[in-house]
A protein has these predicted regions:
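PIN/NYN-family metal-dependent endoribonuclease catalytic core
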Residues: 4-57
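Short amphipathic alpha-helical segments and helix-helix/interface helices
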Residues: 29-34, 62-66, 102
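Active-site neighborhoods of divalent-metal-dependent phosphate/nucleic-acid chemistry enzymes
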Residues: 73-112, 116-118
């Protein structure tokens, strides 16, 4: 099973953990990462994560996120197909970076796109299952 995590998801452990929902999303995301390390899930990476990480003002956080690139089974760069698909996705109200990341995940054939961004979770995106890490684990546990 292949998963693509967006920048919000990768950054969740570095967010303020005061709210229970943030702590739960963090734990779920860390569980997914452990399954990636163990080879149970495959991590899909895209140029968008490289781009967004470059703007992270916290160097340590950026470095920790970028280490995950070495565990990715595939890394997708910008292409005409991705640009075209991203343009279509932007019509749903997605920002360019988010639309490009989704387009990459779809072209990579990722099974799931994981995000903690509520605005993205509420978009009618087709071609890939979009879940927050908690709901992903809930659906994954039910499928076992």
């Amino acid at each position: 099973m292949s998963v693509c995590l967006d920048n919000c998801c990768f950054n969740r452990p570095f967010d303020d953990q005061t709210l229970l929902i943030i702590r739960l999303e963090t734990e779920a995301k860390l569980y997914v990462q452990e399954r990636i390390r163990e080879g149970e899930f495959e991590l899909c990476w895209s140029f968008v994560l490289d781009y967004e990480s470059a703007f992270n003002p916290f160097e340590e956080v950026c470095n920790r996120i970028m280490k995950w690139k070495t565990l990715a089974c595939v890394d997708y760069d910008l292409s005409d197909e991705v640009s075209t698909k991203a343009d279509d996705l932007m019509k749903l109200g997605l920002k360019q970076a988010d639309a490009s990341h989704f387009a990459c995940a779809i072209y990579l054939g990722a099974d799931y796109f994981l995000t903690t961004d509520k605005k993205i979770l509420n978009k009618p995106i087709t071609g890939i299952k979009v879940l927050n890490p908690i709901d992903f684990l809930r659906s994954y546990s039910c499928a076992e």
